[in-house]
């Protein structure tokens, strides 16, 4: 059932894209001939003008063409495929109101992205909800409930490939009437370990399905999907000035392993970075080590990892985007634990053909799918790889639409330049400036401080060389950032005290405690919060875990430690004068005096005061 793409057809598709591109700037939502109900929803959501990917993709999609689009996260890719699918469904329902069939399938690599896509569909169907039904199969419900949801033949399904195959196997889902297939973040779907599911799905879907492949990068994995599902697709490569690091100031700091914590403390306590920050770390333990460390100094932060319930993860991202939280500590587990292994490429494609394909499609991979020295991999990452299946459908460095992120802090450097590009893509979006700061451990410093050591830091220097090379090709510079270490060293003893409190046992307790707390918030209260949405705002995810020994004095910075510039930055000019004596009367003391005047609290008259020392009688022997 595999539908291989004829190599001769690819250039003609790209020519078609060039023709469409001429009129793209003049396109408006009014000119796209969308259903009035969809246009009304767009107005409600304040969509005024289509983005480049929308203006190019929607007309082509309405003509029934397969589309392979390269556009960055946050460029409007979701609306580019959701709107034409909804338009087609509404047209079919207008012709036959009794029609009940699943005609659209949207595949995504992670649960977070599935929830995000479902949210967009809900907004666009605000005025046609009775005519269009959509279901998110990644929700944490029983198989019986999911079977009931599918029994009514929803028009549109959002899911990971694994959930689709599971429901196909149990006959709960039928794809006989499928007309639209979308694979969002296509380059990740295969590298997240869904290769077997994708192959099974290619055999299950009917011929002639219109396919959308959406990705931030066009890699060999996307080429594999194109061969499986597409028929002479139109290739849209949207070269945006903001793409892949433009507008982002990139800095790197060479430091020892324990100095990562020292510099992080100084950055946040002295407020060297203004705005929202995402801290990327290697695994879940590192998440809680950094969180507990920052707690010692009264710095609040949220943790985001695959152990937390999906509802909690989604709520954290939503509240972060609203500005409720300023710091998120995210575990980029898929990247570090090796779950992003490359898809087994077809043996029919030779190395030369593959390289030619990458050049054609603008691959962002720089021959660095694995950490350096594959034959010298440490045993530690291999052990972690066993647990990677648990977070298979979790991913935070790609796909999720973080908004107004001022800085990405690579606390642990990723193992590939591709992952680095995806991480820094969380900032500097929508024309705004952003900053990426990465900590790099020199080879001679690796392993010197075992409590804070992380296995992948062994490859930091070689990975950095690839990152610099990759960014140079894109005309971006990775600059060294130098801290004034004489001033920073003044904080070292405080960092050492705090780090000593964050033991392995404290980290385990913190993990267990937060999971218990989030499970209560996520599961038991889910329905309550659906009925009372205002109370959901009261839920906080940045509370202190208090698993480590708290030292209150660390929350205060003495003036003698503060550099003169930093003292001005932190101290507020508007703080009023606070005297040594209290000017206003004490409320309780005032009440006592009033009561005494009324006779309350007085001792009965005639009772003489007794001096216990004068009335003390020595007992007889």
UniProtKB/Swiss-Prot annotation:
Xref: Gene3D superfamilies: P-loop containing nucleotide triphosphate hydrolases
UniProt binding sites for ATP: 71-78
Assigned keywords, A-Z: ATP-binding, Helicase, Hydrolase, Nucleotide-binding, Nucleus, Ribosome biogenesis, RNA-binding, rRNA processing
Residue stretches making up the Helicase C-terminal domain: 247-489
Pfam families per record: DEAD (PF00270), Helicase_C (PF00271)
SMART domains reported in the protein's UniProt record: DEXDc, HELICc
Biased composition regions of type Acidic residues, renumbered to the chain: 364-373
Record domain Helicase ATP-binding: where: 58-236
Entry protein name: ATP-dependent RNA helicase dbp9
Organism field: Aspergillus clavatus (strain ATCC 1007 / CBS 513.65 / DSM 816 / NCTC 3887 / NRRL 1 / QM 1276 / 107)
